[in-house]
């Protein structure tokens, strides 16, 4: 049944009576059948700008309709190549430039309109680039000509006209409401609210105008009663009129309302609702204006002051949005024209009348279902602002800001479409107010149709492709349409009666006197509200005084904290100095350990070289003695055999002749004895000199070696002592670190950080307190709770910041502390290894020296024995009877030898030559061996002397006393002793060779 006020009836009610659970009898839905969004593409003809630019047509569409495929040539090719390379998009319907407005309505909006009459929520969206005909498609020519629409009328006028024609034919009771909102620069605006479009912030009755806000339906029950009472005062007419004010036809329809028995469940819900309404009405002041929607939907959870969603699913509703009741299409068209006048429109290079905002025209239908029940359905007609290229449209300043906001909201809409198509787990509805408003239409419980408008010109081919991409993706979005919920008729009738009584009372009070007046009850109610507000102001003042005193205490605490922070800063600086000192010591210790390690390696190599040199020297000495003995023995045996052979030959071949041979034999005998004595004397002198030199040089050499070993031992003891001191310093720093962790870690006051949070908290509290004083309609308890939450949140943030700061300060100290432990352990292990290695090396050197000393003593003893044996050789020669007998036989055989004397002399000369050769051979062998050995030893000694300066440069100061001179003093005696032994050996060899020649 239509409901009408004489002045069209402004309805400032912010509540929709269809959402509250207690006011809805039931919600009948069809099975959860998923339906895809219907997508249609409308391509206009080229406009004057595109024709003047001579931009060719690149979009291939039918002239009117018929095909479901649209292709666009973006390559610039022609003929078959253009058809092969063209991009193709498939949608549900395609309309060309020849398609009329009536055809668009019948094909796209008509099916949704029938579902809307049946009780479904429906949405029609127009999407596309600027200047492609979106507003023309949705609105067109909204005027009536002789009671008829023109051919250019858009979807909204046709829906309004067809709606009332259909309702009159069905002859059912109904109520129709309209609302018109605009989204401009991400701000919602009610286009039907004349006060919000003026310069004043208050309405004609002195009420403050409130901004539109979007809420989820799940938060509807949490709205406070103060907001409901404020919204009630803005109410004008939200229900059907009485019979006296209705037209005859409307009155006839109204009489058809009758009350029948309801099911028990419906009666119980109705009785509960009546009881709740009676309690709420008795508690409110009689003079205050009543909010129709709030009184209809009161529950135990409180009254609402916003337009609630139409169902109990997770939808959205808009707070402070006005809904206007209409009884015919003309009233709806008047509201549409009123809203369009206030819509943001500007001129750009691409469009002379470019819409700079998104608009949603909503039609809400309360249609009688059966008996006392009315079904609620909605139809949202959305005209989206067009996306545009700022450079091409020439938008500057405010126009550029508008274009950016439009493109941003459309970009978010594109992301929502992509997420729905990809079935993503997160749909970014909340990133834009546009997507929040369209949340039910995209993937929700609404039947939706999308009309994409495009331009055929090549100059806009890029935007056309983008529009078609989104349209083809939106075709894959699935919705689950549901029938609307129910509301009871008696609730509507009661609210109508209360609202009309209030309006008549105010009207009579106004007519009785000049100016604007109100009834006595209304005046008393206003006074009581003022007294309540005064009490709230007093409470706010007391709260401000309390906060001021608390602020003074906080200032004092802040001063104390500053002093504490200064002392802590001094301690921190001292601690930083200590840490730097410890770091320097650790670096120095690390370098020292590296130098010690390098020196240790070099010393080990030198020790190995010395051991190898001594071993090689001993080996060569033994080989030389063995070779010399073997060679001498071999030559002497050879010489002896030759002499015996010659003597035998002389004995066999000689003929005793009577010659004067006796003097010669005596001479030979004397000469032999003389040679033996000479050889004995020289041998004694040689061995005595050798023994004397060895006895004189050996003690010096061993004393020097022992002194150097003692020096090395003292140096190593000093080094070990210094290492121990460094380790004790490190241990002391470790104890200091432990003391810091025990006394200071997590015990810093961090008062400066707390003061910052306290200051910010105080500023926020002061700001919110000022807002609280200015907006005294809000409840003080809610304000205090919010302040408490804010303080707790800031304290939590401050605590977290203190903990994070303390951990950040401690982290480098902890890492250095752990590294110092590793360095201490490495230093300790390396020190022990170095000490053990040097001790073992010194022990080996000492054992080697002892062995060498024993060997030399044994050699001296052997040489003394050989000298004593040589002294006995002469006496043995004198007492040798065989020797004397031989000489006697020589005398007897003098005659025999006389004939062969020449041959014997010749043979003797040849043997003398052989002995000379033997001597030369022995001398060459000794020289070659001595030269090689001396060269090898000299080379080894030179290498050692070269390494000593390099080591002394890299050694620590406490080891610098071990230099090349000390090593030279150790090596030189050994070198001289070896050279003396070689010379003595050569002298002995030469003397022995000479004596052998003399003997021969």
Swiss-Prot record:
Give GO cellular component annotations, separated by semicolons. Answer: astral microtubule; kinetochore; kinetochore microtubule; mitochondrion; mitotic spindle; nucleus; spindle microtubule
Segments carrying the region annotation (Disordered) are 1-28, 220-248, 260-312, 970-1000
Where mainly found? Answer: cytoplasm
Q: Which gene encodes it?
A: CIN8
Q: What is the organism field in this record?
A: Saccharomyces cerevisiae (strain ATCC 204508 / S288c)
Q: What is this protein called?
A: Kinesin-like protein CIN8
Q: Which residues form a coiled coil?
A: 518-615, 860-904
SUPFAM superfamilies hit by this protein:
P-loop containing nucleoside triphosphate hydrolases
Q: Which Gene3D superfamilies match?
A: Kinesin motor domain
> Which residues take part in binding ATP?
128-135
Subcellular location as annotated: Cytoplasm, Cytoskeleton, Spindle; Mitochondrion
Pfam families given for it? Kinesin
The UniProt regions of compositional bias labelled Low complexity, in chain numbering, are: 220-242, 277-301
Q: What does this protein do?
A: Elongates the mitotic spindle by interacting with spindle microtubules to generate an outward force pushing spindle poles apart. Following spindle assembly, CIN8 and KIP1 apparently act to oppose a force, possibly generated by KAR3, that draws separated poles back together.
Domain named Kinesin motor: which ranges?
36-477
Per UniProt, which keywords does this protein have? ATP-binding, Cell cycle, Cell division, Coiled coil, Cytoplasm, Cytoskeleton, Microtubule, Mitochondrion, Mitosis, Motor protein, Nucleotide-binding, Phosphoprotein
Family the entry assigns: Belongs to the TRAFAC class myosin-kinesin ATPase superfamily. Kinesin family. BimC subfamily.
InterPro entries registered for this protein in UniProt: KIF11-like (IPR047149), KIF11-like_kin_motor_dom (IPR047241), Kinesin_motor_CS (IPR019821), Kinesin_motor_dom (IPR001752), Kinesin_motor_dom_sf (IPR036961), P-loop_NTPase (IPR027417)
Q: Where is the composition biased (Polar residues)?
A: 1-26, 261-276, 302-312
């Amino acid at each position: 049944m239509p409901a009408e006020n004489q002045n069209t009836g402004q309805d400032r009610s912010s509540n929709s009576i269809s959402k509250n659970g207690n006011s809805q009898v039931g919600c009948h839905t069809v099975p959860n059948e998923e339906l895809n969004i219907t997508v249609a593409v409308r391509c206009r003809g080229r406009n004057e700008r595109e024709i003047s630019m001579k931009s060719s047509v690149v979009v291939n569409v039918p002239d009117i309709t018929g095909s479901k495929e649209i292709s666009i040539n973006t390559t610039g090719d022609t003929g078959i190549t253009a058809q092969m390379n063209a991009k193709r998009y498939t949608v549900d319907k395609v309309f060309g430039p020849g398609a009329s407005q009536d055809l668009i309505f019948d094909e796209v909006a008509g099916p949704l309109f029938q579902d809307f009459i049946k009780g479904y929520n429906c949405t029609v969206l127009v999407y596309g680039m600027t200047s492609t005909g979106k507003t023309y498609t949705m609105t067109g020519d909204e005027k009536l000509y002789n009671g008829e629409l023109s051919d250019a009328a858009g979807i909204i006028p046709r829906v309004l006209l067809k709606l009332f024609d259909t309702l009159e034919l069905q002859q059912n009771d109904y109520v129709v409401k309209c609302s018109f909102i605009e989204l401009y620069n991400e701000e919602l605006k009610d286009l039907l609210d004349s006060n919000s479009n003026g310069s004043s912030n208050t309405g004609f009755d002195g009420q403050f105008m409130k901004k539109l806000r979007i809420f989820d339906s799940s938060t509807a029950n949490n709205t406070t009663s103060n907001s409901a009472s404020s919204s009630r005062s803005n109410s004008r007419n939200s229900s059907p009129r009485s019979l006296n004010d209705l037209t005859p036809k409307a009155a006839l329809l109204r009489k058809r309302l009758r009350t029948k028995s309801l099911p028990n469940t419906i009666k119980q819900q109705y009785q509960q609702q009546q009881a709740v309404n009676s309690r709420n009405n008795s508690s409110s002041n009689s003079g205050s204006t009543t909010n129709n929607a709030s009184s209809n939907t009161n529950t135990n959870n409180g009254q609402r002051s916003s337009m609630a969603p139409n169902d109990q699913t997770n939808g959205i509703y808009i707070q402070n949005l006005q809904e206007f009741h209409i009884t015919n299409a003309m009233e709806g068209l008047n509201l549409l024209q009123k809203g369009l006048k206030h819509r943001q429109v500007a001129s750009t290079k691409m469009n002379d009348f470019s819409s700079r905002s998104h608009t949603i025209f909503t039609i809400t239908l309360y249609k009688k279902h059966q008996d006392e029940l009315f079904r609620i359905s909605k139809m949202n007609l959305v005209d989206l602002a067009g996306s545009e290229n700022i450079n091409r449209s020439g938008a500057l300043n405010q126009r550029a800001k508008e274009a950016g906001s439009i493109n941003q909201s459309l970009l978010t809409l594109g992301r929502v479409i992509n997420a729905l198509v990809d079935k993503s787990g997160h749909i970014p509805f909340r990133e834009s107010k546009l997507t929040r408003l369209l949340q039910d239409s995209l993937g929700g419980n609404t039947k939706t149709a999308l009309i994409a408008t495009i331009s055929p010109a090549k100059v806009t081919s890029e935007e056309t492709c983008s529009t078609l991409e989104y349209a083809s993706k939106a075709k894959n979005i699935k919705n689950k349409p549901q029938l609307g919920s129910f509301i009871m008729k008696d609730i509507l009738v009661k609210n109508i009666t209360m609202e009309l009584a209030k309006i008549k009372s105010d009207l009579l009070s106004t007519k009785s006197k000049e100016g604007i007046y109100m009834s006595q009850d209304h005046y008393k109610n206003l006074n009581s509200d003022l007294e309540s507000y005064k009490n709230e102001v007093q409470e706010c003042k007391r709260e401000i005084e309390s906060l001021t005193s608390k602020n003074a205490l906080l200032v004092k605490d802040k001063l104390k904290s500053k002093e504490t922070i200064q002392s802590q800063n001094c301690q921190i600086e001292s601690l930083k100095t200590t840490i730097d000192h410890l770091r320097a010591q650790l670096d120095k210790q690390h370098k020292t350990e590296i130098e010690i390690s390098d020196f240790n390696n070099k010393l080990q190599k030198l020790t190995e070289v010395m051991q190898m040199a001594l071993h090689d020297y001993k080996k060569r000495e033994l080989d030389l003695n063995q070779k010399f003995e073997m060679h001498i023995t071999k030559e002497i045996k050879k010489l002896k055999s030759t002499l015996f052979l010659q003597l035998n030959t002389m004995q066999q071949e000689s003929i005793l002749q009577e010659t004067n041979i006796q003097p010669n034999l005596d001479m030979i005998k004397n000469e032999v004895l003389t040679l033996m004595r000479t050889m004995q004397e020289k041998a004694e002198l040689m061995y005595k000199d050798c023994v004397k030199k060895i006895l004189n040089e050996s003690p010096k050499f061993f004393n020097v070696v022992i002194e150097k070993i003692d020096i090395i031992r003292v140096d190593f003891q000093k080094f070990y002592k210094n290492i121990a001191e460094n380790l004790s310093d490190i241990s002391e720093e470790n104890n200091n670190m432990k003391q810091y962790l025990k006394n200071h870690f997590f015990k810093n006051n961090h008062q400066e950080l707390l003061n910052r949070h306290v200051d910010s908290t105080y500023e926020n509290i002061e700001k919110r307190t000022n807002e609280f004083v200015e907006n005294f309609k809000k409840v003080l308890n809610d304000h205090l709770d919010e302040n408490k939450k804010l303080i707790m949140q800031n304290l939590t943030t401050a605590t977290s910041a203190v903990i994070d700061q303390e951990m950040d300060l401690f982290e480098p100290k902890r890492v250095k502390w752990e590294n110092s432990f590793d360095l201490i352990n490495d230093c300790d292990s390396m020190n022990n290894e170095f000490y053990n290695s040097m001790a073992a090396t010194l022990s080996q050197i000492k054992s080697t020296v002892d062995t060498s000393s024993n060997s030399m003593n044994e050699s001296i003893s052997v040489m003394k024995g050989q000298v004593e044996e040589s002294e006995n050789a002469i006496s043995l020669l004198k007492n040798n009877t065989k020797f004397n007998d031989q000489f006697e036989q020589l005398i007897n055989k003098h005659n025999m030898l006389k004939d062969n004397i020449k041959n014997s002399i010749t043979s003797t000369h040849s043997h003398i030559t052989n002995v000379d050769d033997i001597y030369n051979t022995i001398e060459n062998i000794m020289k070659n061996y001595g030269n090689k050995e001396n060269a090898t030893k000299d080379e080894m000694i030179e290498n050692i002397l070269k390494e000593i300066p390099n080591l002394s440069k890299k050694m620590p100061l406490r080891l610098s006393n071990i230099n090349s001179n000390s090593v030279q003093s150790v090596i030189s005696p050994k070198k001289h002793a070896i050279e003396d032994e070689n010379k003595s050996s050569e002298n002995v060899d030469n003397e022995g060779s000479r004596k052998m020649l003399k003997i021969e």
